[in-house]
Amino acid sequence: MEEIFKIGQIVNTHGIKGEVKVYPLTEDVNKFKKLKTVLIDGEHRNIQSVKFQKDRVILKIEGIDTMNDAETYKQKYIEIFRSNAPELEADTHYIVDLIGCMVYDADNMELGKIFDVISTPSNDVYWIKQPKELLIPVLKDIVLDIDIENKKIVVKPVRQWQDED
């Protein structure tokens, strides 16, 4: 399992005092409020303040004190250690842990590896690219078992839930 998570990407500067504008890579941006320290390029950095602006997070990070300083951090990722990540509710998983899991149907037919997880308003969707592109809705009646330790997910046979149109 990954021990370091990307939780955001610095996309721009904000103001003249070294704040950075962050595109969050997490559904719950309120998680940023709980952060005390993050990693940028493998270096520990203390968070001094967190604000929100539309769909972005504005961070003041210790050691980034001018707009010129902040400019050098554009496109860099903000990461945290798994041990600092918030605890998940039962039956939920970090996307980073799902990516790369092999998906099988209940008949033990291999469907492929999860390439990405797409978040939609109603439910997440597992995206498999190989050997054949397949989008699997993450619903309790379709996803039967998730075994993160063994990187294995079992779903109902596709013919039972996919439209043939």
Swiss-Prot record:
Q: Which GO terms describe its molecular function?
A: ribosome binding
Name one matching Pfam family. Answer: RimM
Taxonomy, superkingdom: Bacteria
User: Which residue spans adopt a coiled-coil conformation according to this UniProt entry?
Assistant: none
Q: Which cysteines are joined by disulfide bonds?
A: none
The membrane spanning regions, by residue number, are: none
Subcellular location(s): the record lists: Cytoplasm
Annotated family: Belongs to the RimM family.
Q: In UniProt terms, what function does this protein have? A: An accessory protein needed during the final step in the assembly of 30S ribosomal subunit, possibly for assembly of the head region. Essential for efficient processing of 16S rRNA. May be needed both before and after RbfA during the maturation of 16S rRNA. It has affinity for free ribosomal 30S subunits but not for 70S ribosomes.
Q: What is known of its domains?
A: The PRC barrel domain binds ribosomal protein uS19.
Protein name, entry field:
Ribosome maturation factor RimM
- Tell me which species this is from: Clostridium botulinum (strain Alaska E43 / Type E3)
Organism lineage reads as: Bacteria, Bacillati, Bacillota, Clostridia, Eubacteriales
From the UniProt record, report the name of the gene that encodes this protein.
rimM
